[in-house]
Each structure stands twice: as C-alpha cells, then as structure tokens.
C-alpha cells in the first residue's frame, strides 16, 4: 500500500523542515519499506542539519530505503542569478545535486527522457504534402490556464483551423508591436524573459493561445505562476525542431495555419533514452560521487491536481520509479533469501547500481557518472 505524506501546503512552494521531519517519523512508525522524496534544494552536502540527517539515519536503521530526486538545476552555473551563493563559471565545482538526495544514506536519482510520449498536439496545414502531427507539453493546465485541447471544440476549428503568427524576438511587448496577434495563436521562442511574461504579453496583444518553442529538443515544465489573474490563455511548449518546422511553413509573412487535435497521440520522443538536460550534475563539494542512479523522469504521463492527467518532466518523476524498483527488490530479497531489515536495505543500492545500464549520448559516448550515476 501507499502512504501519502502531504508536506506542501495548498499555496506553498516549499516545505518546512519540521513538516518533513514529522512525515519521515510517521513513515518510520508506520513501517514503510521505501520512502520517496520528490523534493530538494540545490547544491547539497553529504551531511545535512543534525535533525534531518538523524531522521534519515533512523529510517536506514529501520531497514527503509530512501530515494530522492537529484534535482532539476543542471549545474550551479546554469541560470545562476547573482546573490544565490552558487558557484560561478570559473569554479571547477559545478555540482548542483539537491539535498536530501546528497545525503549518504539516500539514493540520488537522475532523470532520463522517456522513449515515447503520450501527447496532445496539433497538425500542421502545409500548402503541399501531408499534415505533420506536432506534440505539445501543456504546462499551463497546472497553473490555472485553459487546456490546449479546448481549442479543438471552438468555432475556429470547425472552420478549418487556426492561424498562428511567428512573434519576432522572445515575446517582449515590443516584439508583439511588430506583428498582428489579435485572434491568432502566438508562436514565441524561449529565452531571456520568464514564460509568464511571454504569456501575459500575448494576452495583452489579443492572442488566443501561446506556443513556446524550446531551444532544445526536449520539453520542460514551464512555470506560469506569475501570469496575470485574468490571463487563462492555453500556453504550451513544443520542441526546437518542431518550432523550426512551423517557422519555415509560416514563410516570409510569418503566418501559418494549424489544426488542434482532440485525440492524444503516442509519438516517439526525439530525445528519448537520453539524460534530461535539466537533471542536476554532481558530485558533491567533498568529492562524493552523486547522483547514484538514473530513472525515467522526462516526459512522464501521470496524475496531476484536480483529478487530471498530464505529461511532466523532472527528477521528481524519476525518483518514484527508483523507489518502486527498490520495493520490488526488497520483496525479492525477503521471499527468496528471507532477508529483511537493515541487511536487506544495504543490499538494494549496490544491486541496483551494479545492474544499471550506462546511458549513451547520441554520439555513442557514455554520459559522465557525474550526470547519470551508475546508469539507468
């Protein structure tokens, strides 16, 4: 059975240490076999605060395997704002693995992209050739925005689809002054300004939806928590390659057409089987090698708030898969070798690491163990 420990409030972006400690204590008292921690803070150490470290050690002594997300910060030098006390590009130590996954008694889990994606999306409307299905990542739905698939039932769709306009630049307000986005879908490139600002600028320009083109081949979960209260535009992301397709079809006038699909499609991910770009690099400041393992965390279709389903990416999606594998291995050790408690727990991590498959880059070279740990 699952023990669900709620540590985040309805309107909180973080959890207090006291609440986390209470949840860990409850999990130990209730006899959990595995504890999954899909949370963390960038740039952790192998030992944390006394109370937190002691709680993790108590779990280990009780024979509980603890898995935690390695973090989604790439490295300490990527997107590093001033005043955050993180390393600079001149610092050799670029590790950003999150606490508590950095703790000695915790398995730190990196993220690998799913090979297949169940995605909603739209079809292009080329002047010649077959329409191409383009999948989208609908991050907006989890921030109170309308789902992209709601466009499939509107009048424009019944009349043959929607027009989209390629917004120059990165979607600043002055970029929108150079195009007519009124009643159209705004196609905007990622970069420089927040996703919420791009969406608000499109809303102000009269756009009916926003498609953000990533600057990489994969999807990321866009943070739209800062958009205006009255802005509920559908806001989705597509890959860099698909963005280039739409730009080419738009031609010199920057206008194109698309048809939103009401049916979800299973499509092969362009970056499937590769380490997720956001997955945090190790190791730790004391030269401990982290993360320990990698699991599928990129483009995972699962449950969301409000009884909905959707696709999300993050090491928080990878850690539960490793936790599930740990639970199955504990069961195997118990049923086959009558091994339980701390003895069984101590076998789980080395068994998983020694049987993991190294993940290869697109050129056939293995990713660094500082990125993938022992492998998938």
Can you annotate each of these PLM segments?
Residues 18, 22-25, 29, 54-58, ...:
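Solvent-exposed, polar/charged alpha-helical surfaces in well-ordered, non-transmembrane soluble domains
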Residues 63-66, 70-291, 305:
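Structured lumen-facing ectodomains of secretory-pathway proteins
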Residues 1-44, 89, 107-115, 168-176, ...:
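Subtilisin-like peptidase catalytic core
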Residues 1-16, 30-33, 61, 76-78, ...:
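Subtilisin-like serine protease catalytic core
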Residues 1-3, 7-9, 33, 195-226, ...:
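Hydrolase catalytic cores
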Residues 31, 36-39, 43, 60-63, ...:
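Sec/Tat-exported extracytoplasmic proteins
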Residues 285-289, 356-376:
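Zinc-dependent metallohydrolase catalytic domains
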Residues 2-6, 28, 33-38, 60, ...:
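Structural recognition of the beta-strand scaffold that forms the well-ordered cores
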């Amino acid at each position: 059975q699952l023990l669900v420990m709620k540590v985040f409030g309805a309107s909180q972006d973080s959890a207090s240490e006291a609440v986390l400690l209470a949840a860990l204590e409850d999990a130990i008292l209730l006899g959990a076999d595995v504890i999954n921690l899909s949370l963390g803070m960038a740039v952790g150490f192998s030992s944390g605060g006394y109370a937190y470290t002691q709680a993790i050690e108590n779990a280990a002594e009780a024979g509980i395997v603890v898995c935690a997300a390695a973090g989604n910060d790439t490295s300490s030098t990527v997107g590093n704002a001033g005043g955050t006390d993180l390393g600079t590009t001149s610092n050799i130590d670029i590790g950003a693995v999150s606490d508590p996954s950095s703790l000695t008694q915790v398995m730190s889990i990196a993220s690998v992209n799913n090979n297949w994606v169940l995605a909603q999306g739209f079809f292009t409307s080329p002047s010649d050739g077959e329409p191409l299905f383009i999948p989208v990542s609908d991050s907006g739905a989890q921030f109170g925005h309308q789902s992209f698939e709601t466009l499939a039932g509107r009048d424009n769709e019944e009349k043959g689809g929607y027009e989209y306009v390629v917004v120059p630049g990165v979607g600043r307000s002055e970029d929108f002054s150079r195009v007519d986005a009124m009643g159209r879908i705004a196609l905007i490139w990622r970069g420089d300004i927040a996703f919420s600002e791009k969406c608000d600028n499109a809303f102000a320009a009269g756009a009916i939806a926003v498609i953000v083109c990533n600057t990489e081949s994969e999807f990321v979960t866009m943070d739209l928590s800062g958009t205006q209260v009255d802005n509920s535009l559908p806001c989705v992301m597509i890959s860099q390659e698909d963005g280039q397709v739409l730009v080419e079809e738009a031609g010199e006038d920057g206008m194109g057409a698309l048809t939103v699909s009401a049916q979800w499609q299973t499509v092969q991910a362009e970056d499937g089987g590769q380490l997720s770009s956001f997955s945090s690099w190790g190791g730790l400041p004391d030269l401990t090698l982290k993360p320990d393992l990698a699991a599928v965390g990129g483009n995972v279709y699962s449950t969301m708030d409000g009884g909905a389903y959707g696709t999300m990416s993050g090491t928080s999606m990878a850690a539960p898969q490793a936790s599930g594998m740990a639970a199955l291995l504990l069961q195997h050790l118990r049923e086959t070798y009558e091994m339980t408690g701390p003895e069984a727990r101590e076998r789980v991590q080395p068994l998983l690491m020694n049987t993991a498959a190294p993940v290869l880059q697109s050129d056939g070279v293995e990713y660094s163990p500082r990125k993938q740990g022992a492998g998938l």
